[in-house]
From Swiss-Prot:
Source superkingdom: Bacteria
Residues reported in the UniProt entry to bind (6S)-NADPHX: N56, N57, G58, G59, D60, G122, I123, G124, L125, N126, R127, P128, D151
Pfam families per record: YjeF_N
Keyword Metal-binding: yes
Keywords for the protein's UniProt record, in alphabetical order: Isomerase, Metal-binding, NAD, NADP, Nucleotide-binding, Potassium
Gene name linked to the record: nnrE
Catalytic activity reported: (6R)-NADHX = (6S)-NADHX; (6R)-NADPHX = (6S)-NADPHX
Protein name per the record: NAD(P)H-hydrate epimerase
Organism phylogeny: Bacteria, Pseudomonadati, Pseudomonadota, Betaproteobacteria, Burkholderiales
Length: 206
């Protein structure tokens, strides 16, 4: 699959696993890239809301949240499922967030932020959002605030570009390692993604 057409989820996962097997720590790099993306577009002191889901996409958002908090941003974290079942790398990211003095809540804040980081679901999502997640996505969309999606907007099937329910509408999508093919072809997934950006994290796709 040519880069212009995007890569399959399997191709991206295989490249990720090769890098991890070589001892590469990718989550700190992804989180730093997301934080840098926000910092380049919003002044210090801006209110950032990081939506952290139950997987490693949520871990990327937590790393970004910790870095932005340390840089002087007002950062809020919403974790609808809490930290209890996070995978190991994301659990370390959560510990880093707490060590930075951060706290989290399960619900959205009452006041809309200046910008939202979407770390709810990444390229692994292949089923419709359940009612709880869909309600959250709809509420964020209703704010009409700029959203940075990490890897893929939550609610989009990264392989097909289908929207699984109603997707979070991003102004920007920052893909890591490679852009998923569901974001590169015309369709609802591409429309939800907004402006596409890529950080390879130094990982080569075969």
């Amino acid at each position: 699959m040519r880069a212009e057409s995007g890569y399959s989820v399997l191709q991206i996962r295989q490249a990720e696993q090769r890098a991890l097997a070589q001892g590469r720590a990718l989550m700190p790099l992804a989180g730093a890239a997301a934080a840098g993306f926000i910092a380049a577009r919003f002044p210090v002191g801006s209110v950032v809301l990081a939506l952290a889901g139950p997987g490693n996409n949520g871990g990327d958002a937590l790393v970004a949240a910790a870095r932005l908090l340390a840089a002087g941003y007002t950062v809020r974290v919403t974790m609808p499922r809490g930290p209890q079942a996070l995978p190991p790398d994301a659990a370390r990211a959560y510990a880093g967030w707490r060590a930075q003095g951060g706290a989290e809540q399960s619900n959205l804040p009452s006041d809309p932020p200046d910008v939202v980081i979407d770390g709810l679901f990444g390229i692994g999502l292949n089923r419709p959002l359940d009612a709880t997640w869909q309600t959250l996505v709809d509420a964020v969309n209703a704010w009409n605030r700029p959203v940075l999606a990490l890897d893929v907007p939550s609610g989009v099937d990264a392989d097909s570009g289908r929207v699984l329910g109603r997707a979070l509408r991003a102004r920007w999508t920052l893909s890591f390692i490679g852009a998923a093919r569901g974001l590169c072809a015309p369709g609802p997934g591409r429309e939800a993604a907004g402006e596409l950006h890529l950080d390879t994290l130094g990982v080569a796709l075969a």
